[in-house]
């Protein structure tokens, strides 16, 4: 993560340098700032407000599905990580450790949590005794630490914010139902609120969460064609239950291990929002998630200000009363400067009122997604705003899906064809995107594809647009149809 401190005058076009465009946008929109600690960023108010909107939407859904919030310690004893072999091997390189406290060396190192299965497993073992204690349905909103070598704001940082759900169940069936239920909660939220289309499916064994039996993911395509894993849901089986002795007496008075799940999304979703919808003018936020849905700007010479505000203020109040997140920009800047500023910040809808509009008893509405300018009678303005916000939300999803589908390739069947596709895209500047291909199930084939192309398996989709018959790598019969892509 190059820590660029200078003010961004102009946003680099996406077609010129997508990575530079991304940094320019988040800096110019004032979403974050860098700190002296590598990979640790400040979420400035405009950036944190996006996370608050995501939190609010997901938290509501979690509570509707019976989950409650709790908070567990950030410091985790080293010995806890030894209780689940795969888990410690998966996270060990990324763990930051606390070795001293109070001026003395600690008897046991404490990890800054990379995820909380271990500490939560330890506590569940104290709390769960009987089938009457089940299920346990808990979510935690927290910060976590993974010492990343290559960092990028919001997408890959050493410290990030997330939620992690942890549940315990009496049976495998119940736990698997929970795993899929929460995957669907994520899919619904990201597609309906964030307007981001997803490929939903199961991770291959080499890509699953360390310590899980099965991992499922939602995968999104960014505007540079790369994949972003937007959320995961894990069926952990009894792996952590056995490691932490989480047992219960069932109805027949038999002592059994629980079945557990975990599931999470993080501030990566902010990065996804920017990279899926943003353009060369800056951010473009879907109305349901935008902190400000409508920006109102008075225009015209100062001598007409009272005349304009006599119509401006009542409309502002009416929109606020209707539940629209509306803001008025009354600063001493030119209207043109304000238009560009709020377009760059991604506000879905702009309303302009000038002296001529007052004479005509109308206002001018301008859509961020299409740039369309729509004159609207003032007495219809509130209803039109509500309708336009829904239309913008739908249109942003449709545009993102059309882009994704246009760059999802279904006719590449061999490793040679994949290499040729990548080479052609690099030569022409086209987007390589996602490739749907067959896979025999051999981890060596999956690893070879990654090594030779940097394309990784994203997931085995539940509903693939086609079924592949032969393995992309070895040509043997395919056991799975898999999405491959380069990824963040």
UniProtKB/Swiss-Prot annotation:
It is found in: Cytoplasm. It comes from Symbiobacterium thermophilum (strain DSM 24528 / JCM 14929 / IAM 14863 / T). NCBIfam families: proS_fam_I. InterPro entries: aa-tRNA-synt_IIb, aa-tRNA-synth_II, aa-tRNA-synth_II/BPL/LPL, Anticodon-bd, Anticodon-bd_dom_sf, Pro-tRNA-ligase_IIa, Pro-tRNA-ligase_IIa_arc-type, Pro-tRNA_ligase_II_C. One of its GO terms (molecular function) is proline-tRNA ligase activity. It is an enzyme of class 6 (ligase). Homodimer. This is Proline--tRNA ligase. Consists of three domains: the N-terminal catalytic domain, the anticodon-binding domain and the C-terminal extension. The keyword Heme does not apply. It catalyses: tRNA(Pro) + L-proline + ATP = L-prolyl-tRNA(Pro) + AMP + diphosphate. Pfam families: HGTP_anticodon, ProRS-C_1, tRNA-synt_2b. One of its GO terms (biological process) is prolyl-tRNA aminoacylation.
């Amino acid at each position: 993560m190059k820590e660029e401190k200078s003010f961004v005058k102009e946003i680099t076009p996406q077609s010129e340098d997508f990575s530079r465009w991304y940094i320019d946008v988040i800096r110019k929109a004032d979403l974050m700032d860098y700190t002296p600690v590598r990979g640790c960023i400040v979420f400035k108010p405009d950036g944190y407000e996006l996370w608050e909107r995501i939190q609010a939407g997901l938290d509501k859904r979690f509570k509707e599905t019976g989950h409650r919030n709790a908070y567990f310690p950030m410091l985790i004893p080293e010995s806890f990580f030894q209780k689940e072999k795969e888990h410690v091997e998966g996270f060990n390189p990324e763990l930051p450790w606390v070795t001293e406290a109070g001026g003395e060396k600690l008897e046991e190192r404490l990890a800054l949590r990379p995820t909380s299965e271990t500490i939560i497993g330890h506590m569940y073992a104290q709390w769960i005794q009987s089938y009457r204690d089940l299920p346990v349905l808990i979510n935690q909103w927290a910060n976590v630490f993974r010492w990343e070598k290559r960092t990028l704001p919001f997408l890959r940082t050493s410290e990030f914010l997330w939620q992690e759900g942890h549940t315990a169940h009496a049976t495998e069936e119940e736990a698997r139902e929970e795993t899929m239920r929460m995957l669907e909660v994520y899919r619904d939220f990201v597609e309906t609120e964030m307007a981001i289309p997803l490929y939903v499916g199961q991770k291959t064994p080499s890509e699953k969460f360390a310590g899980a039996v099965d991992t499922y993911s939602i995968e999104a395509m960014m505007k540079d064609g790369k994949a972003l894993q937007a959320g995961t849901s894990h069926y952990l089986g009894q792996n952590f239950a056995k490691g932490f002795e989480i047992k219960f007496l069932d109805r027949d008075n038999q002592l059994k291990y629980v079945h557990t799940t975990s599931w999470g999304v993080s501030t990566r979703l902010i990065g996804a929002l920017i990279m899926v919808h943003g353009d060369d003018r800056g951010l473009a936020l879907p109305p349901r998630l935008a902190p400000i849905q409508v920006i109102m700007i008075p225009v015209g010479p100062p001598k007409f200000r009272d005349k304009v505000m006599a119509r401006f203020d009542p409309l502002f109040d009416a929109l606020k009363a209707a539940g629209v997140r509306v803001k008025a920009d009354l600063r001493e800047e030119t209207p043109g400067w304000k238009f560009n500023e709020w377009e760059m910040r991604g506000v879905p809808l702009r309303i302009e009122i000038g002296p001529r509009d007052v004479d005509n008893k109308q206002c001018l509405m301008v859509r961020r997604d299409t740039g369309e300018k729509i004159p609207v009678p003032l007495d219809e303005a509130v209803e039109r705003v509500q309708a336009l916000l829904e239309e913008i939300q739908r249109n942003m999803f449709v545009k993102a899906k059309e882009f994704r589908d246009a760059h999802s390739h279904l006719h590449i069947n061999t490793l040679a064809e994949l290499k040729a596709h990548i080479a052609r895209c690099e030569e022409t500047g086209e987007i390589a995107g996602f490739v749907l291909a067959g896979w025999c199930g051999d981890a060596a084939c999956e690893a070879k594809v990654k090594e030779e192309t940097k394309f990784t398996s994203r997931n085995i989709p539940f509903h693939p647009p086609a079924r592949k018959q032969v393995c992309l790598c070895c040509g043997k019969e395919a056991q799975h149809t898999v999405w491959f892509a380069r990824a963040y």
